[in-house]
Amino acid sequence: MSGNSQLPPDVIGFICSKYDIILASTSPRRYEILHDIMGITDLKTMVSTFEENLDKMNYSTDPIGYVCDTSWHKAQNIIEILTDYEDENPNEIDKPKLIICADTIIIDKSGRIYEKPKTKEVQKKFLMKFCYEDDEPVNVVTAVTLIKWYGRENFELVPFRDETKVYFDNKIPLRILEEYVESGDGLEVGGGFKIQGQGAILIEKIEGDYYNVVGLPLNKTFKGLYAEANSI
């Protein structure tokens, strides 16, 4: 991703003058969206230690609830970390924080959740299903939980989500799909494809925010940050 098209620096400067902006994720794609595209050059990071082990069987009829709850639990874990830090450093005075927690899943028309394939064999099965078996798009859902943090006794959680429909090309030659799998690209992402990489070859079109498929809905995330900065 290129950082050539950033939002006006005075807008980002306004938000950053009110809050420290923190990404609670190790995802390089989410970092690039916020740092390179949105232009938050002083972006800080934290790591949630939530195990992301919610039982999917409890969400068989509500897969979107799974991603929303995962994002929410990540935020709750960050609150615990911030609270512990505040307890250990009672005299430290920090700027208020806006912390971005997120989780992304791929869902097919039946409600099945597709996670990281980890092996090329599983990845190929995923992509063949998306391209040749399903007659409807897959749904990419990112749930975001913003933490508006002033301190352990003064914080607020602001959840939102975005959905993007991804239409795979059912006429793509199998050889091309197999070559993509052999490239190793997409093994470590949900669904087994990267829209920002060679995986885009397999995709005919999308409906919704491109950056949501990458890992974070840029438009809704920016509006969330801007709204909170304006609420002071």
Curated annotation (Swiss-Prot):
Effect of K74A: Loss of activity
Gene Ontology biological-process annotations: nucleotide metabolic process
CDD domains recorded: Maf
Name of protein: dTTP/UTP pyrophosphatase
Lineage: superkingdom: Eukaryota
Location(s), subcellular: Cytoplasm
HAMAP family, A to Z: Maf
UniProt cross-references to Gene3D superfamilies, sorted A to Z: 3.90.950.10
NCBIfam families in UniProt: maf
Reaction(s) this enzyme catalyzes, per UniProt: dTTP + H2O = dTMP + diphosphate + H(+); UTP + H2O = UMP + diphosphate + H(+); 5-methyl-UTP + H2O = 5-methyl-UMP + diphosphate + H(+); psi-UTP + H2O = psi-UMP + diphosphate + H(+)
Cofactor entry: a divalent metal cation
Described function: Nucleoside triphosphate pyrophosphatase that hydrolyzes dTTP and UTP. Can also hydrolyze the modified nucleotides 5-methyl-UTP (m(5)UTP) and pseudo-UTP. Has weak activity with CTP. May have a dual role in cell division arrest and in preventing the incorporation of modified nucleotides into cellular nucleic acids.
GO MF: dTTP diphosphatase activity; nucleoside triphosphate diphosphatase activity; UTP diphosphatase activity
Keywords: Cytoplasm, Hydrolase, Nucleotide metabolism
Major site of localization recorded for this protein: cytoplasm
E.C. designation(s): 3.6.1.9
GO CC annotation terms, alphabetical: cytoplasm
Source species of the chain: Saccharomyces cerevisiae (strain ATCC 204508 / S288c) (Baker's yeast)
SUPFAM superfamilies with a match to the protein in the record: ITPase-like
